[in-house]
Amino acid sequence: MAEITTREKLHEVALSAPKTSGVYLWKDKAGTVIYVGKAKSLKNRLSSYFTSNRDIKTRILVSRAESIEYIQTENEYEALLLENTLIKKHKPRYNINLKDGKTYPVLKLTNEEFPKVYRTRNIKNDGSKYFGPFPNVSAVDMFLTLIKHNYTLRQCKQLKKRETPCLYFHIGRCKAPCCGKISAEEYGKDIEEITLLLEGEMEDVSGTLKEKMKEAAEKKEFEKAARLRDGIQAVYALRGQNIVQDMDPESRDYIAWAFEGAMVSIAVLKMRNGRLVGRDLYRSHSLKEEGEILSEFISAYYTSANEVPPKIFIPQAAEGNALIEKWLNEELHAKTRISIIPLEKESLAAEERSAADSLTEIEEAASKTIGYAVKEPAPLSAQEEKLNLSPAEIKHHKAALKMARFNAKEDAMRRLREQGDFAAVEDLQKRLNLPCLPQRIEGFDIAHLGGTFTVAALISFKEGNPDKKNYRIFRLKNTDGVIDDYASMREVIARRYTRLLNEGADLPDLILIDGGIGQVNAASKIVDALDLGIPVIGLAEKNEEVYFPHNSKPVILPRRSDALRLLQRIRDEAHRFSNTRNNKLRRANKLKTEFENLPHIGKKRAHVLLKAFGSTENLKTLTAQALSETAKISLKQAEEVLDAVKTTNNNN
């Protein structure tokens, strides 16, 4: 008799569940809760996960689950309360987790004696001034370039007293407050002008900038004039985006969402006292159906009564609306009402609009009143009539919801472009008979030059595309100067996964090695010793053969298969990343040697000069006095160094 599969066991649990309301928990092999859901009928809901036409996000859950548990409740509202409690307790991987949320950037003017201005997405209660949020990141960057070239503010992360100024002072990009070369009062004059620009009081300041642009053009300094022109345009663009006002003083939120596979994008427009004060954009795993997403999101998004506005508007009816409104009022003690204002389905042309056009529409929306994009309203529907709002008010709220939905859909499309290769992930699992979908794959490659400058590259792919925030480079300690790829592989695998285990971090579903059976066996030895239970494979470049540990007979994948294409992408990316870092180390060593070969410059001074100026070529622009202060050598010695630099460059 064939052994029963995990899927069949889970299906039996679903079929035996009661038809009462309750909460269910999916767990993986380690007993970790990976998803929590609620149901009016536990049996009906759990059984629905095993129908043949389920979507990708459901197949992901079933492939990763090892067991199901459920808790019965007296009614659906109790199930909602219990679900919320369990989600906060277990923080399951496939429930909404707002830690990964994304918002539009703001500009931060720090609360310091010598402030700096920079872009951030994190707003803290630290006394700093914040301006924004700004949808157009390019305009923010152009504005910062304007600041950098015209106001010479400090650029260091922390202001520390120094004896000699940094490179930015010598090239005219900083006034060196760290060395006392400018007073706080004088520095503050630039800060006042920048603040006026950001607050919209810009006529005098922009006039000065336009005069500078005109002067630069007359002097044929066209690059400088172009920077000033772009900066002035950025200032006007940001002024349009900084606030959006309307005539309704009541506070409210507009929430819309868009699904893509197992991920959901949710946009929130926050209106307070007639002003758009924020646009929050969140991405998260969620296995909820579209009609259920609202209750899970709201219970995660709002955590106290003062965060909840009197009104929340959504674009479509959702399961559990009444329950979540009851939860807000009774559990958070917030007096609020959730209202539905249906939006017409967008045309195919609108949905396929390019990203550039989409961004333009967002900017236009942000620079006008929020009723920017709605045509003359059709007669009110029965649902709209129940809201007791005028046609003009309905039009107004529809425009805001349309803007929220547009943001969510654009984010979903952007994510699809970033990581949409799920077909290859499924094909890889099927062809290599892997135990679960390899959603997270980590690839390794070793690079060296005759055993020197040995580095190991770790690259990460998530759901079929690069996950660059998890890329890592390892300078190998035990094999530098020795050609031993197997020992190098053992070292990097041990360092990587010992750390992940100690931190309790998520492990990958598959490890890919750039190499053949020898490298695979070396990596597998460490994986087995750590008892990770992660499959290890290798891709040999010569014939594109896939190797498993302790099996010299390779698997040959079809040349045009999605699975092989994905493995090649990962292998090639790891190879590129390791070689790039290896070459960088070799160049840095060459440059350091060039500094060390200069008179009066030893290893320590070479390190200081390399960090400050980057190359000996850049020393030619310095005065002997500046070099003397930076390298801490006498003026005569500095002159000899500069003479040596000029002689060397002339010979080359």
UniProtKB/Swiss-Prot annotation:
InterPro entries xrefs: GIY-YIG_endonuc (IPR000305), GIY-YIG_endonuc_sf (IPR035901), GIY-YIG_UvrC_Cho (IPR047296), RuvA_2-like (IPR010994), UVR_dom (IPR001943), UVR_dom_sf (IPR036876), UvrABC_protein_C (IPR050066), UvrC (IPR004791)
Keyword DNA damage: yes
Superkingdom: Bacteria
GO molecular function: DNA binding; excinuclease ABC activity
Occurrences of domain GIY-YIG (ranges): 19-96
Any Gene Ontology CC annotation: excinuclease repair complex
Disulfide bridge partners, by residue number: none
SMART domains reported for this sequence: GIYc
Localization per record: Cytoplasm
Self-association and partners: Interacts with UvrB in an incision complex.
Similarity field: Belongs to the UvrC family.
Annotated NCBIfam families: uvrC
Function field: The UvrABC repair system catalyzes the recognition and processing of DNA lesions. UvrC both incises the 5' and 3' sides of the lesion. The N-terminal half is responsible for the 3' incision and the C-terminal half is responsible for the 5' incision.
Protein name as annotated: UvrABC system protein C
Organism: Treponema denticola (strain ATCC 35405 / DSM 14222 / CIP 103919 / JCM 8153 / KCTC 15104)
Biological classification of the source: Bacteria, Pseudomonadati, Spirochaetota, Spirochaetia, Spirochaetales
